[in-house]
């Protein structure tokens, strides 16, 4: 925690001409997806009552409350730290940029979570994740349509392999793999759009502000969104114990504060297509950790999917031909 808070103290909202470093970008994205993999394993245990305290199982935590609390708690933790170290004046944003970051928090972070959980409720985890990980295709299409990138064979291959690998890793080829439901499928597609949006919009806003400012206002706007969807009295009515709230505090750090700070840092060093292909490591880590920690089986088809995702990441990070576009921002560390 000390080193994490120390990095906040050294951040500055002023642009510094730091050269983008792709290796650091991939390391940041990998760290973020690893944390999300841990969060997925913890979340699964929380949903099913698999959390233990002093040898006793804690009562299951509602997925909606788990998603809501992690953004709200993250904002409440981050705000006083930044306020104390930077002062209120350095936390203010122009109205236009404030609006953009609010949209990033609501349409990107909060909406992707909301539609993802709605899709799980209406279909299953495999269907939700498989459709959500069509987001790399959406990002590539957007970047090409706007003229930011060319549709090279390298990019198309990497995006295609990332999608196929994620589908196999999640278990689309297994029993109960893909389940159709109009509302559930629609929600999963909207989750993919939201995921793609916060990769592209996040990359753009990080050209002007450091990751901590972006994280502060995205968690704020996402928290407000969740308060509308799930009002405070519903939280009170859940009657969670002190141990459950302690878990929610830890979960906020593992699922939002740490991984989003890493992911936003990665977006400062990588253009959105490469970043979102690398993000396909998340289901890989989730599956491996679930196998190691929860005893879930890892089938050969899932192992093949993991290998394909890794191949996609290797392909997307290969150097482009001379004259390729440069769409990374100058990192504000």
What is each of the regions a protein language model found here?
Residues 1-65, 177-204, 329-333:
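Glycine-/small-residue-enriched transmembrane alpha-helix faces in small-molecule transporters
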Residues 37, 41, 72, 105-110, ...:
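Hydrophobic/small/kink-forming positions within alpha-helical transmembrane segments
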Residues 69, 109, 113, 128-134, ...:
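Helix-helix packing/entry segments at the starts of transmembrane helices
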Residues 41-58, 89-91, 121, 170-181, ...:
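Membrane-interface helix termini and inter-helical loops of multi-pass transporters
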Residues 83-126, 168, 252-270:
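Specific transmembrane alpha-helical segments of multi-pass solute transporters/efflux pumps
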Residues 78, 82, 142, 151-173, ...:
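Hydrophobic transmembrane alpha-helices of multi-pass small-molecule transport proteins
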Residues 46, 66, 70, 119, ...:
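Hydrophobic/aromatic residues within transmembrane alpha-helices
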Residues 23-31, 35, 60-84, 100-103, ...:
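Hydrophobic alpha-helical transmembrane segments of multi-pass integral membrane proteins
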